[in-house]
Amino acid sequence: YRRRRRRGRRGRRRRGRRRRSRGRRRAHGG
């Protein structure tokens, strides 16, 4: 099970600089 949790570089981790996604603000209603 631990091996499946590894997502590699596309994982959801908050580390270092933030990347702005285009068109993702609509999900928050902004």
Curated annotation (Swiss-Prot):
- What is a biological process (GO) this protein takes part in? chromosome condensation
Expression tissues: Testis.
Q: Which GO terms describe its molecular function?
A: DNA binding
Sorted keywords for this record are: Chromosome, Developmental protein, Differentiation, DNA condensation, DNA-binding, Nucleosome core, Nucleus, Spermatogenesis
Where do the record's region annotations for Disordered lie?
1-30
Q: Which GO terms describe its cellular component?
A: nucleosome; nucleus
Q: What is its main location?
A: nucleus
Q: Does the keyword Cell cycle apply?
A: no
Membrane-spanning residues where? none
Function in brief: Protamines substitute for histones in the chromatin of sperm during the haploid phase of spermatogenesis. They compact sperm DNA into a highly condensed, stable and inactive complex.
Please report the name of this protein according to its UniProt entry: Sperm protamine P5
Which source organism does the UniProt entry give? Octopus vulgaris (Common octopus)
